């Protein structure tokens, strides 16, 4: 009986520590989701602002090219639809989100150089990407099952971004900016979706459907 009473304080402390860790985890998730939502909104605004400077025929042609083309980050293996996203583990969604954010660290800098209309937003984006990357890394490190072996596809390096647009031709600058912004918007939407689902799972909500 005495041993039971001795164990009770230990169990209570353990319970409080566990609750504290869960609260901190949710706080980090809230911050990460808020950051990526803001990034997604900035990406949409930058794309819409640039799209608004194009002539109708130019816009249609670039949209057709983009639909047939691919983004540099497409080499990162990620869920292809809502169903696959729902089936993915929290840790897998965090790892994919981290790699997607990491893949934009250099390209976000090129936006500052390539289009003077977007300098202010691009500066915001570079800083917010760095903050979000740190936050996602904390979530990965603090995960209860933080060990996850990456398969060959996950561990592959992205192709050098500098070579991605080397064969665009005479209209390369306009097409380059269009594809950069369209891909950035697409990837921020992905990360927002993945982090929102991961946050919901960690909060133990009954319904985490997209």
From Swiss-Prot:
CDD domains tied to this protein: somatotropin_like
One MF annotation (Gene Ontology) recorded for this entry: growth hormone receptor binding
Cellular compartment(s): Secreted
Ligand binding (Zn(2+)): 38, 192
Keyword Zinc: yes
Domain of life: Eukaryota
Gene3D superfamilies noted in UniProt: 1.20.1250.10
Cysteines paired by S-S bonds: 71-183, 200-208
Keywords: Disulfide bond, Hormone, Metal-binding, Secreted, Signal, Zinc
GO biological process: animal organ development; calcium ion homeostasis; growth hormone receptor signaling pathway; hyperosmotic salinity response; magnesium ion homeostasis; negative regulation of testosterone secretion; positive regulation of growth; positive regulation of phagocytosis
The keyword Coiled coil belongs to this UniProt entry's keyword annotation: no
Signal peptide: 1-22
GO cellular component term of the entry, any: extracellular space
Its job: Growth hormone plays an important role in growth control and is involved in the regulation of several anabolic processes. Implicated as an osmoregulatory substance important for seawater adaptation.
Family per record: Belongs to the somatotropin/prolactin family.
Protein name per Swiss-Prot or TrEMBL: Somatotropin
